[in-house]
Design a protein with these regions (language model features):
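Alpha-helical transmembrane segments of multipass membrane proteins
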Residues: 8, 16, 51-55, 74-82, ...
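Conserved Sensor-2/SRH helix of P-loop NTPases
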Residues: 61, 90, 146
Length: 350
């Protein structure tokens, strides 16, 4: 219902919204076309696809959940060139491919749920609804919702600020953000994989194993991210050229990518620490870290760095934020974990 209302409001106020976000007369038509297909028409299928996938994974059906996500992603990759180049739909083709792929994922998950009818606790029947768990769901999910909302707000701010330098920086940043998102999505996959392990061991009081799982995940994310950084730094220009052959945008984007990728390892670890706290049921602590990182630091620093340094200052902002937040995140985790250990020792003595 929330997604439906958001999609409707986005459609009604699409013109002032796109103008506020920095769409120029040259790019307004493309932006509006993408917005209508992906957000207005594709918003509900996108949200349903994500929700059904996470519900499957939460019940231990990780393989079909991953298959559903992969199905939508692979279908999107196949449809993109067909619609963009084959049917000459340009930006609208990419948007249609994304919307249709998410709808196909929803159909896939519905079929899976029908097949798992006797092995799943998920039901849409109203008689099973209860307010008993609403508070717990919101408590744990608040940090993720806050991270997504503030992350989108940060992107809106940087697109708005970069639009003051022309369409080329906006295009270059948009491509860099997509490339930069790939290693972060790998980290998100790690998060979804290790959260049940952390949660189960934390609930069982097996803190030694919980810490081992957490630190292993953090180290893995750090090593994988470092490999991506090396790749992006060494091959920034050809990577950008794959997305856009236009020389000026490609060159500017390569410079952006070499800077932006430096923040990826620290961002990955900060993400994992926040999700570790969520898995421990510490939604408040996780939300504090998220708000501090995106709200208190990122957005104000974007504006400040743009004022003091200019266009490149905004690109350096993410690295600065992650450097500041890493010791804060780690300190929050250690404080929370040590508090729980002390509490348990006291209970054992009693």
């Amino acid at each position: 219902m929330t997604t439906l209302v958001f999609s409707l409001l986005t459609f009604l106020f699409r013109r002032p919204l796109l103008n506020f976000l920095g769409a120029s007369p040259d790019t307004f038509g493309y932006a509006q076309s993408y917005l209508i297909w992906v957000v207005v028409l594709g918003g509900v299928p996108t949200m349903l696809s994500l929700t059904l996938g996470h519900l499957l994974r939460s019940e231990g059906h990780a393989r079909p959940a991953s298959a559903g996500m992969m199905f939508g992603g692979i279908l999107n990759v196949i449809l993109d060139p067909v619609l963009i180049f084959g049917f000459h739909l340009d930006v609208a083709g990419a948007a249609i491919a994304a919307a249709f792929s998410n709808l196909a994922s929803v159909v896939f998950f519905v079929v899976i749920y029908i097949r798992l009818a006797d092995r799943t606790a998920v039901s849409l029947l109203p008689r099973y609804f209860t307010f008993r768990f609403v508070g717990q769901i919101f408590s744990v999910g608040l940090a993720t919702a806050l991270a997504t909302a503030l992350g989108n707000a940060s992107n809106m701010v940087i697109v708005r600020l970069s639009s003051g330098y022309g369409d080329i920086p906006v295009a270059a940043y948009g491509i860099v953000k997509r490339i930069d998102q790939f290693p972060l999505n790998v980290s998100m996959g790690l998060c979804q994989g290790f959260m049940p392990l952390v949660g189960y061991n934390y609930a069982a009081g097996n803190y030694k194993r919980m810490r081992a799982v957490s630190f292993f995940s953090w180290k893995t994310a750090l090593i994988m991210s470092a490999c991506f950084v090396a790749c992006f730094a060494a091959f920034a220009q050809p990577i950008m050229h794959l997305f856009i052959p236009e020389a000026q945008t490609s060159t500017l984007g390569a410079s952006f990518l070499r800077i932006a990728c430096l923040a990826v390892p620290l961002t990955s670890v900060n993400f994992l620490i926040s999700y570790t706290l969520q898995a421990m049921g510490k939604g408040t602590q996780s939300a504090i870290l998220t708000f501090s990182r995106q709200g208190l630091l990122n957005i104000p620093l974007l504006i400040l760095m743009n004022t003091l340094v200019g266009l490149y200052g905004m690109i350096w902002t993410q690295l600065l934020v992650e450097v500041i937040m890493l010791p804060v995140s780690f300190g929050m985790y250690l404080h929370t974990a040590s508090d729980k250990s002390r509490t348990n020792r006291s209970e054992v003595k009693k």
